[in-house]
């Protein structure tokens, strides 16, 4: 409610995709991180049909292909992702396995566009980290067929499993470059 009272969270799926596409000039180089939110909103389909150079990681067939596209994504004009959680004060909390998504968030692409559902909003950083460990990570481990305790129990065990996807924890307090990170908060539950 506090976010809505500030005029946030009143964008819905169709408007979110339209808003995000409005940032992209023709021919822009665009990359993305793994995200159920981008899939559920239709953003991925929209990017695949847009007049852009799309670095689509879904086409990668080998680990070498993935490494190259992750590297090239750091030089993209625009990088699309969701966030694992965000506080009511606007801090972003992301926990990553490979680090490619948080690397792009921190540095590299000229612009970062984040689509996030209201279910990602937490009171503070501690609650946001808990949200990731108790909701996002277990569900992602199941989806990705990871052999982790949380994929079995649904609860984070703070594991150090070889399949662990909680390898980097990044809290973004603000963007060092004004306007580089754009958050589109969607008034629906999306992603994990």
Residue spans of the language-model regions?
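Single conserved hydrophobic/aromatic residue that forms the stacking wall/gate
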Residues: 1-8, 12
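Gly/Ser/Thr-rich loops at beta-strand to alpha-helix junctions
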Residues: 13-14, 34-40, 85-89
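Short, well-ordered alpha-helical microsegments
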Residues: 16-18, 39-41, 102
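Conserved phosphate- and dinucleotide-binding cores of soluble alpha/beta proteins
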Residues: 73-192
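Glycine-rich phosphate/diphosphate-binding loops that line cofactor/substrate pockets in enzymes
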Residues: 16-28
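A glycine-rich, hydrophobic loop/mini-helix early in the fold
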Residues: 26-80
């Amino acid at each position: 409610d506090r976010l809505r009272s500030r005029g946030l969270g009143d964008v819905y799926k169709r408007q979110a995709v339209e808003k995000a596409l409005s940032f992209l000039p023709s021919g822009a180089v665009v990359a993305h991180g793994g995200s159920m939110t981008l899939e559920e909103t239709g953003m991925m389909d929209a990017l695949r049909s847009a007049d852009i150079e799309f670095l689509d990681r879904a086409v990668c067939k080998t680990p070498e292909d993935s490494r190259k596209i992750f590297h090239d994504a750091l030089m993209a004009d625009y990088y699309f992702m969701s966030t694992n959680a965000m506080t009511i004060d606007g801090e972003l909390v992301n926990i990553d396995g490979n680090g490619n998504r948080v690397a792009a968030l921190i540095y590299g692409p000229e612009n970062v566009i984040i689509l996030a559902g209201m279910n990602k909003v937490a009171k503070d950083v501690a609650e946001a980290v808990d949200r990731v460990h108790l909701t996002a990570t277990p569900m992602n481990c199941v989806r990705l067929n990871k052999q982790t305790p949380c994929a079995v129990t649904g609860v984070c065990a703070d594991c150090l499993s070889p399949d662990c996807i909680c390898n980097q924890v990044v809290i973004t307090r603000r963007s060092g470059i004004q306007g580089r990170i754009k958050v589109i908060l969607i008034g629906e539950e999306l992603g994990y």
